[in-house]
Structures are given as structure tokens and as C-alpha cells.
Regions:
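Polybasic "coupling" helices that flank or enter modular domains
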Residues: 102, 106-142
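Cyclic-nucleotide recognition modules
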Residues: 11-12, 56-113, 120
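Cyclic nucleotide-binding regulatory module and flanking cytosolic helices
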Residues: 1-23, 65-66, 70-71
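Glycine- and acidic-residue-biased ligand/ion/polar-headgroup-sensing regions
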Residues: 33-46, 62-63
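A short beta-strand-loop-beta hairpin characteristic of the jelly-roll/cupin
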Residues: 43-56
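A short beta-loop-beta micro-motif enriched in histidine and acidic residues
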Residues: 12, 24-35, 53-55, 75-78
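A cytosolic small-molecule/anion-sensing beta-strand core signal
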Residues: 20-21, 39-40, 61, 85
Length: 142
């Protein structure tokens, strides 16, 4: 397993932010322009419905990262990330992320692998949901 924190480039520029439990780390209505590296704590990803309801769709813990899809695809996706415990997060600007990807094949592979894992997790979740009855989907959502 790739140890993200031990492979941070010495010249990597980032901002350290601390978030309290329940604070929003990534706001779906704002453009961040950063890769978020969760250094410590836990955070959850929520999909926001049109009525304001929140559906927990993913959880991060330990050392992980998020925000890469928006940076690399150039599309904003309306997901919110909220701290479920106190968290420390490094924010890496897009230009620094791209430089890091060019210079470190291990990091490039790690990021590709994490994106693939997220894609498979979401695909599995969608498949399981599609097999539920309407009643089961409703009960799962409350």
C-alpha cells in the first residue's frame, strides 16, 4: 500500500486546515481548486437532494484524499464532505497536484487506484440499489 504522507514531495506547497466534528470540509456550491488529503480523522461524503436531504454515500478515514475527480475532469460535482470527527486536512492546489503527478509515478498509480476503487464502490452501490423494491429503497433512505 502506498503511504501517501511519507511520499509528499519536499517542495510540495499545501495549506493545513483543521476541522471540528460536523464542519463542512468541501462545500458543493463552491469551487475549491484543491486536492484534499485527509491526514487524520474521519469524513463523510453526502449527496444533497433538491429538498435539502442528505444521503451519505461514502466515508473517508485515516490517510485518504478527495477532490481529485473535480480537478482532473474539470467538472464540479455537487457533493458535500463533512467531518464526522475532528480532522486535519492538507489542501493541495491544482498546479501542485499536476506537478506531483508528473514527478511521482507511485503517487499517480495511487491516485488512479483510488479513483478506480471509488468508481467500483459506486457501481456496486448502484447495482444493489437497482435490485431493491421501491419500498426497500424508501426505507433505506430514511
Amino acid at each position: 500500500m502506498y503511504d501517501l504522507l511519507s511520499h509528499l514531495p519536499k517542495n510540495l506547497s499545501f495549506i493545513t486546515r483543521n476541522f471540528k466534528k460536523s464542519e463542512t470540509i468541501l462545500d458543493p456550491y463552491q469551487t475549491s481548486g484543491c486536492l484534499y488529503i485527509l491526514v487524520s480523522g474521519k469524513a463523510a461524503v453526502y449527496n444533497l437532494g433538491i429538498d435539502g436531504e442528505e444521503l451519505n454515500i461514502y466515508e473517508y478515514c485515516g490517510t485518504d484524499c478527495f477532490g481529485e475527480i473535480e480537478l482532473l475532469c474539470g467538472r464540479r460535482y455537487p457533493l458535500m464532505v463533512r467531518a464526522t470527527t475532528d480532522c486535519t486536512v492538507y489542501l493541495v492546489a491544482k498546479r501542485d497536484l499536476l506537478q506531483w503527478l508528473k514527478e511521482d509515478p507511485g503517487f499517480s498509480f495511487f491516485l488512479l487506484k483510488r479513483m478506480s476503487e471509488k468508481l467500483l464502490d459506486n457501481s456496486d452501490r448502484m447495482t444493489r440499489l437497482s435490485l431493491l423494491t421501491m419500498r426497500e429503497r424508501y426505507l433505506l433512505s430514511i
